[in-house]
Amino acid sequence: MGGAAQNNNLSNNNNDSPPASPVLEGRDSPDLPLTMAASTILTALPRDATAALAAAGGFPQEKVVVRFRPVGSAPAIRRDLVKVISTHKFDSVVAYLRKMLKVPETDGVFLYINNTFAPALDEVVGNLWRCFKDSSDHLIVSYSMSPAFG
């Protein structure tokens, strides 16, 4: 009787076979990115995606125009419009302004974009220009000898 009951159970469970790849319950598997070589669906990037990726890291202009504006009692500089290479970091703008104002290393100079925020020194000037340029395509950099905003 035990053998007949066992055969009966086996024939009823044919539809309840385990999945081809077992799933571990209670453990989420992380979503890992697939490389192009491992993907069976996507064998090449579409043409428009390839063009977009090629242009993503570049800047539309090799140099951008930065306009300096003094705030408060900060002295004005002669050349308030300068061209800066798009790939330079913002610290090069700070160094240029320090040189023009003849500010010693011990004194502070505070720079702000559009009188709003002080960017990090490692920000790329081209990215700042792309996001915060004015209607004249100038990046407005206000400067002060003491904290002016915030």
UniProtKB/Swiss-Prot annotation:
One Pfam family per UniProt: APG12
Renumbered residue ranges of the record's region Disordered: 1-29
Compositional bias segments (type: Low complexity): 1-18
Highest taxon in the source lineage: Eukaryota
CC per GO annotation: Atg12-Atg5-Atg16 complex; autophagosome membrane; phagophore assembly site membrane
Bridged cysteine pairs (disulfide): none
Family (UniProt): Belongs to the ATG12 family.
Quaternary context: Forms a conjugate with ATG5.
Role summary: Ubiquitin-like protein involved in cytoplasm to vacuole transport (Cvt), autophagy vesicles formation, mitophagy, and nucleophagy. Conjugation with ATG5 through a ubiquitin-like conjugating system involving also ATG7 as an E1-like activating enzyme and ATG10 as an E2-like conjugating enzyme, is essential for its function. The ATG12-ATG5 conjugate functions as an E3-like enzyme which is required for lipidation of ATG8 and ATG8 association to the vesicle membranes.
Protein name: Ubiquitin-like protein ATG12
Organism: Chaetomium globosum (strain ATCC 6205 / CBS 148.51 / DSM 1962 / NBRC 6347 / NRRL 1970)
